[in-house]
């Protein structure tokens, strides 16, 4: 469970995972770096909230509903809702680079966190297997676009993602065997989404280089 903790006192500040990132974007601006992009612009908040609501219910949480379903009906309902929403999102992104407006917003970040795990984990481990992310041309290009944007792919550790799910969820994967695949080298392939326009960071600037101790090896180099 994500949480913000006051380190000196050890006191929990908040564990409201739905609000933490929004609070960071709106209430903690004094701690933002110079040039930090506005990921939750006030004129677009109603639309962002609406988009995020569907993404959370059917995609972010939907994969877990399918993966931890206790009955066939429960699984099939979650499965259907997941792919119905993914189809809607794919259609929305067919002619626009980002989910809301022409810059990256909180909605894109929340969708990315599930898309980046989809083929390595959710497709097999959670039985969300109608199709792979790589088989949806729009979502696959969109995910690669974000992955190749500073602040996204340079923080993704696919090896850790796979080990976490396959070794921790012993009720689903009792052998704790971690799959060798899938091939992840495609994440660095050209996406051509820049042709749709948009300004990734809006009036802000990209983040600086990842600190040496936090750098992740790109999949193509593994």
Please place each PLM-identified region on the residue numbering.
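C-terminal alpha-helical interaction module
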Residues: 1-222
């Amino acid at each position: 469970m994500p949480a913000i903790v006051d380190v000196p006192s050890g006191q929990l500040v908040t564990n409201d995972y739905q609000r933490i990132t929004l609070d960071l974007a709106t209430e903690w601006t004094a701690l933002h770096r110079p040039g930090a992009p506005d990921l939750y612009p006030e004129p677009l908040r109603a639309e962002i909230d609406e988009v995020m609501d569907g993404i959370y219910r059917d995609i972010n949480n939907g994969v877990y509903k399918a993966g931890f379903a206790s009955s066939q009906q429960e699984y099939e309902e979650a499965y259907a809702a997941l792919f119905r929403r993914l189809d809607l999102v794919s259609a929305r992104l067919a002619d626009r680079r980002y989910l809301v407006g022409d810059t990256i917003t909180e909605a894109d970040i929340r969708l990315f966190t599930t898309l980046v795990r989809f083929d390595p984990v959710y497709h097999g481990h959670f039985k969300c297997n109608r199709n792979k992310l790589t088989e949806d041309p729009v979502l696959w290009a969109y995910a690669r676009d974000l992955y190749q944007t500073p602040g996204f792919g340079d923080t993704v550790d696919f090896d850790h993602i796979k080990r976490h799910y396959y070794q921790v969820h012993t009720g689903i994967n009792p052998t704790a065997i971690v799959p060798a695949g899938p091939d992840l080298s495609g994440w660095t392939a050209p996406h051509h989404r820049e042709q749709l326009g948009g300004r990734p960071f809006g009036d802000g600037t990209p983040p600086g280089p990842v600190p040496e101790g936090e750098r992740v090896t790109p999949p193509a180099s593994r």
